[in-house]
C-alpha cells in the first residue's frame, strides 16, 4: 500500500511539474518579432549624415537632350538628370523611373584601386560604375552601354539634390538624395537605408539608421 501511495505521489508531482513548465514556458519569437538594432555608423559616416542634414537643397535643370542621330547622343540621356561635383570627380545620372538601376554614378580619374573585371566575355565592364543591387551599393559593374552622362551640371558644394521623381514603390518621396561636398559625393537611398561616399580617393558604401 505504501509503495502504491509513493508511486501515486511521484506521478502527481511529476504531472504538476510538467504543468508548471508548460505554464512558464515562453514560445520562441517569430522572425517578425525580433528587433534588429539600427546600424551604428562610424564617426566619419555620422559626420557625412550630419552634413547631409544641414546642406542646402538645390534644384538642377535636366541636361538638354540630343537628337537620336547625334554621334554624342549616347552620352546625353532623355528624361534624366545629370550632375557632378564641382571638381568633376564624381558624375551621377538619375533616370525618371521608379526602380532600382535608374540611378548610376561614376568616379572619374580614380586614385584608388578599382575592381578588376570578372570573367564575363559578353558584357561591357565599367570599373568605376556605381549602382545599387541586392548587395547594396557597389563599384565596378557590367553595363551594356555608358549609363552616366559625359557632361553634367555641377552641384555646388554643401548642396544636396533631392531626387523626388525617384520614388519608392509605395509612393513616398524622396527615395534618393545626393550631397556634394569638398571631400566628395554622398548619396542616400532612404528605401534601403544604404548610402555611399565617393571621391577620387575612395568609394565607401555604408548603412545608416533609417531615422536620420
Regions found by a protein language model. Name each.
Residues 1-8:
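Bacterial N-terminal signal peptides that target proteins for export
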Residues 98-111, 184-193:
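Lectin-like carbohydrate-binding module/patch detector with strong preference for beta-trefoil
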Residues 151-159, 163-212:
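Extracellularly exposed regions in secreted/surface proteins, prominently low-complexity, repeat-rich
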